[in-house]
Regions:
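Alpha-helical protein-protein interaction modules
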Residues: 1-150
Length: 150
């Protein structure tokens, strides 16, 4: 419950409350270590530090200090396309469907605009689904075999 409240606090701009709620919270993918909760809020408070902090999260997952899916979800919270650097397979690695939903949050615009996002969409089959049943608000076709998302 605290995780969802922390996300609500982030989306409403109440970052100090979010900082408190994220400390050691159980996320969709695992537990958020307190020091990384602080870093994520630091990145949201100071966007100039976002890429630096994203790099710290990526490095922590590569050394095993931070679980890969926790790192991935953390990078989604700050909207960093560096989440792709973790080599997460959207089909075999991401079992929690709610984690898939997080890619559509307002904070994930940069993530969706990264060229690697198209590969994800295609691997998941979303593009074929959208062509058949209609496009979501955040994506649109740009040609017979191409699309963009915001």
């Amino acid at each position: 419950r605290d995780y969802y409240l922390a996300l609500a606090a982030i989306y409403s701009g109440n970052l100090e409350t979010a900082r408190d709620l994220l400390q050691g919270v159980k996320m969709r993918s695992g537990t958020m270590p307190a020091e990384y909760a602080d870093l994520l809020i630091d990145a949201l408070e100071d966007p100039a530090r976002k890429n630096e902090i994203a790099g710290m999260v990526v490095n922590a997952t590569k050394t095993g200090e931070l679980d890969k899916l926790v790192g991935f979800e953390s990078l989604l919270i700050i909207g960093s396309p560096r989440a792709f650097d973790l080599g997460i397979d959207p089909v075999s690695d991401v079992k929690n469907l709610q984690l898939h939903a997080q890619i559509w949050n307002n904070s994930a615009v940069e993530f969706r605009q990264d060229p690697r996002f198209k590969e994800w969409v295609e691997e998941l089959g979303y593009d074929d689904f959208w062509r058949k049943y209609g496009w979501p608000d955040r994506c649109r076709p740009t040609g017979p075999n191409n699309f963009e998302c915001i």
